[in-house]
């Protein structure tokens, strides 16, 4: 595969059919998948992340699956370094790298580089998570509002991951994150590649919502609750961790904690998945170079294959 060929980013909201499209592409090209997903990186979290099955992984080489224990974190900076390395390695084997997944922050880091902000500090992060477990994220959001009003104003009081990062930056740098971003400098080693986003998007939002509900019910039937129960039984995991905050896992965790009944947890998980899909679509529609395939159309995977052929021939 030529190093000058564009790299296809197969993106789309959750439940859009990216996995099926990936398998269709693998029948046409000798590809390897670089997963762009902040949930499938975790070992022992298979059902609720819709991780490719062992049979699917046997058909198509997959990268960045099962690379972290759920007690560990994985940053956008780590993803960027891993993805750039993998792209070069895959091309050196004469194969085609395909970026596939729905974590838009990872795509942004890969395309645009990273802000020159302090690296994560595990000790400080653990301290913030402990305080949040004791006081709640709205209390930490109020603290952020005093330190960095501009950043706090654009974050929801329960946006734990972003509140945590903003407080971390304030503490480590002594400056508000908003001030640092205002005069930010992107990493000098901008990516040498051209990325083309091929986005699976629904022509009917209600139909996607129905898919989301059906898929989550299938996860429950497939053993999601037992999967979360096993994670919880370890004793070293808690709801402040990025792994446990994943959609579906945090709602089932709350149910096992006795906070809500199973039906309420199910409804909350489906609603959270819909909200995630909405955020993913909002980000995708702002991308300058984006080709769209209706994920609800007949033979959507075949249409993806046709569009990729056009991209590579361009």
From Swiss-Prot:
InterPro entries: Dimethylallyltransferase, IPT, P-loop_NTPase
Marked site: Interaction with substrate tRNA: 103, 125
Pfam family, one: IPPT
Coiled-coil regions listed in the entry: none
Enzyme Commission designation: 2.5.1.75
GO biological process: tRNA modification
Chain sites annotated for binding ATP: 12-19
Reactions this protein catalyses: adenosine(37) in tRNA + dimethylallyl diphosphate = N(6)-dimethylallyladenosine(37) in tRNA + diphosphate
Keyword ATP-binding part of the UniProt annotation: yes
Cofactor(s) the protein requires to work: Mg(2+)
PANTHER family in UniProt: TRNA DIMETHYLALLYLTRANSFERASE
Family named by the database record: Belongs to the IPP transferase family.
NCBIfam families assigned: miaA
Cited HAMAP family: IPP_trans (MF_00185)
Name used for this protein in its record: tRNA dimethylallyltransferase
Source organism of the structure: Bordetella petrii (strain ATCC BAA-461 / DSM 12804 / CCUG 43448)
Record gene name: miaA
């Amino acid at each position: 595969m030529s190093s000058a060929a564009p790299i296809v980013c197969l993106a789309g909201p959750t439940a859009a059919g990216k996995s099926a499209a990936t398998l269709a592409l693998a029948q046409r090209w000798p590809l390897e998948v670089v997963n762009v997903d902040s949930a499938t990186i975790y070992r022992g979290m298979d059902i609720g992340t819709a991780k490719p099955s062992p049979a699917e992984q046997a058909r198509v080489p997959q990268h960045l699956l099962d690379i972290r224990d759920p007690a560990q974190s994985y940053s956008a900076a780590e993803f960027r370094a891993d993805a750039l390395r993998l792209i070069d390695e895959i091309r050196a084997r004469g194969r085609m790298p395909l970026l596939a997944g729905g974590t838009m922050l990872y795509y942004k880091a890969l395309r645009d580089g990273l802000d020159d902000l302090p690296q994560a500090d595990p000790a400080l992060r653990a301290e913030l998570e402990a305080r949040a477990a004791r006081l709640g994220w709205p209390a930490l959001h109020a603290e952020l509002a005093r330190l960095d009003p501009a950043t706090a104003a654009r974050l929801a009081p329960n946006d734990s991951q972003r509140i945590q990062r903003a407080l971390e930056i304030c503490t480590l740098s002594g400056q508000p994150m908003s001030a640092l971003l205002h005069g930010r400098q992107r990493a000098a080693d901008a990516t040498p590649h051209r990325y083309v986003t091929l986005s699976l998007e629904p022509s009917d939002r209600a139909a996607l919502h129905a898919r989301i509900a059906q898929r989550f019910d299938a996860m429950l039937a497939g053993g999601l609750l037992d999967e979360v129960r096993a994670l919880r039984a370890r004793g070293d995991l808690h709801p402040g961790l990025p792994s446990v905050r994943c959609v579906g896992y945090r709602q089932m965790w709350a149910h096992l904690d006795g906070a809500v009944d199973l039906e309420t947890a199910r409804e909350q998980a489906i609603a959270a998945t819909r909200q995630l899909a909405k955020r993913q679509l909002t980000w995708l529609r702002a991308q300058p170079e984006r080709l769209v395939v209706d994920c609800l159309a007949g033979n959507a995977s075949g249409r993806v294959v046709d569009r990729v052929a056009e991209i590579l021939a361009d």
